[in-house]
């Protein structure tokens, strides 16, 4: 018998790039894998229930943002000048609707703000203080910038800042969920 093909797929990763062997202890690597497994399980269960791919992406990214282990939300990398500023973007591949925020410092879950931009505004992007005012208007949770600080990221920033390399590499976290449904292709110019 031919195995039944799943009606959906879920892909996630906790950062791009290859970390040199020995960067993390086996316990730290286990913590990364456990959190990714938790996020994948939540996303898989949502897709099995029939939740939309966009809802799944938002929920899974929020799990990563809430964890100090990943470079999204809590645990974000520091900018070259020692600040924490975050971006997030989300898109519905079926409708081509998109929303994003950039350069924010107090929105607990930037992905929720990006989703709110997509669903509740005529714009595609808000940035900085404007993005934070938008998030407050829609009662998204705001936190003090210290919430995002982790000693690990501070030490990484300090090491890069003090090095002669002169740059700071930012690894991105991302999630993608696909639903196997017919998609009506639209002329992109009709959308924008």
Language-model features and meaning:
Residues 2-192:
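Alpha/propeptide regions of enzymes that mature by internal proteolysis
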């Amino acid at each position: 018998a031919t195995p039944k093909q799943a009606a959906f797929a879920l892909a996630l990763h906790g950062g791009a790039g290859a970390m040199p062997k020995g960067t993390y202890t086996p316990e730290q690597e286990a913590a990364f894998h456990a959190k990714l497994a938790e996020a994948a399980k939540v996303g898989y269960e949502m897709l099995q229930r029939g939740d939309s791919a966009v809802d799944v992406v938002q929920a899974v990214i929020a799990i990563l943002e809430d964890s100090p282990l990943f470079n999204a939300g809590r645990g974000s990398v520091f900018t070259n000048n020692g600040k924490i500023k975050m971006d997030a973007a989300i898109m519905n591949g079926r409708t081509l609707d998109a929303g994003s925020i950039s350069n924010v410092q107090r929105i607990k879950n930037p992905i929720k703000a990006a989703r709110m931009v997509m669903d509740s505004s005529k714009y595609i992007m808000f940035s900085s203080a404007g993005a934070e005012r938008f998030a407050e208007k829609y009662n998204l949770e705001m936190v003090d910038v210290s919430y995002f600080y982790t000693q690990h990221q501070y030490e990484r920033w300090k090491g890069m800042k003090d090095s002669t390399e002169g740059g700071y590499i930012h690894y991105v976290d991302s999630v993608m969920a696909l639903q196997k449904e017919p998609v009506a292709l639209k002329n992109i110019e009709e959308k924008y």
